[in-house]
Structure formats: structure tokens, C-alpha cells
A protein has these predicted regions:
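Structured mid-to-C-terminal alpha-helical surface segments
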Residues: 1-137
Length: 137
């Protein structure tokens, strides 16, 4: 083994991972049952600093590749989705089943995610995401 070349591992960047999850959320809309995508975006944005330009570029590329409109007008971000008892129950079940380390209400997670992704769609000139403050600077 020692005389073999090191293996090459292909992996998504965090920015591409977020872009892929965000596109799936927007694409699936109201009938989205991929609560892990919401949770992952929430957790990653609570933990890591992101470059606005790098993350926005990943989002643009992903949405263009999938031919998905870049808009926050998805039913997945609507009050109707958030207040739907079925989605609320499924969110709680997801957290329990996955033994989520960060327990967060669906409402709090969605508010945080919206603050994180909205400027990416609006093209607002920002520099970096501050995970401690929960805002773009």
C-alpha cells in the first residue's frame, strides 16, 4: 500500500452542498419532505463563515444547471408551509429520529435560513457570513 499513489477523493465544497440543498428545497416547494436539507443548511450556517461571492456563485451555478428559478417565492418558504401541522410534526419526528445534536424549532430554523439565503437571491453586495451573529457583513 505504501508504494501506491494516494487516493483521490472527490467531494463537494460546503458552498456547493448548500447550493444543492437549497435548490432541492426550492424545487420541491410545499410538498418538500427533505427536512434534512433544511436542517443541514441551518447547522452549516450556524457553524461556518462563508464568503458571499463563493456561496452566491455556487448557488447561481447550481440553479442554472438545474434550470430552477432563483427566487425566495417558493412555497417551501411560505407561512403556509411553516404553519402546516403535518410539516411541524414531520420536522419534530426528523429531529427525534436523527438524534439531532442541535434541537431547533422549525420556525426558528426557517427564520435563520431565510436570513442566510435571501441576500444570495437578491444579489445584495455582502462580504461574508458571520455565524455568531447570524448575518451577512
Amino acid at each position: 500500500i505504501l508504494d501506491m499513489e494516494p487516493p483521490r477523493v472527490n467531494a463537494y465544497t460546503l458552498e456547493t452542498s448548500i447550493a444543492e440543498k437549497l435548490e432541492a428545497i426550492i424545487h420541491n416547494g410545499y410538498f418538500n419532505s427533505r427536512y434534512k436539507d433544511f436542517y443541514d443548511i441551518y447547522v452549516l450556517s450556524k457553524k461556518y463563515v462563508f464568503s458571499y461571492a463563493e456561496l452566491r456563485n455556487a448557488v447561481i451555478q447550481t440553479f442554472e444547471n438545474r434550470k430552477t428559478p432563483m427566487t425566495m417565492d417558493s412555497a417551501a418558504f411560505s407561512d403556509e408551509f411553516l404553519n402546516d401541522p403535518v410539516h411541524q410534526t414531520r420536522w419534530k419526528s426528523f429531529l427525534k429520529k436523527k438524534k439531532a445534536l442541535i434541537q431547533v424549532s422549525m420556525s426558528d430554523a426557517m427564520d435563520w435560513i431565510k436570513a442566510f439565503v435571501r441576500p444570495l437571491f437578491e444579489g445584495t453586495e455582502k462580504t461574508r457570513w458571520n455565524p455568531e451573529k447570524g448575518n451577512w457583513e
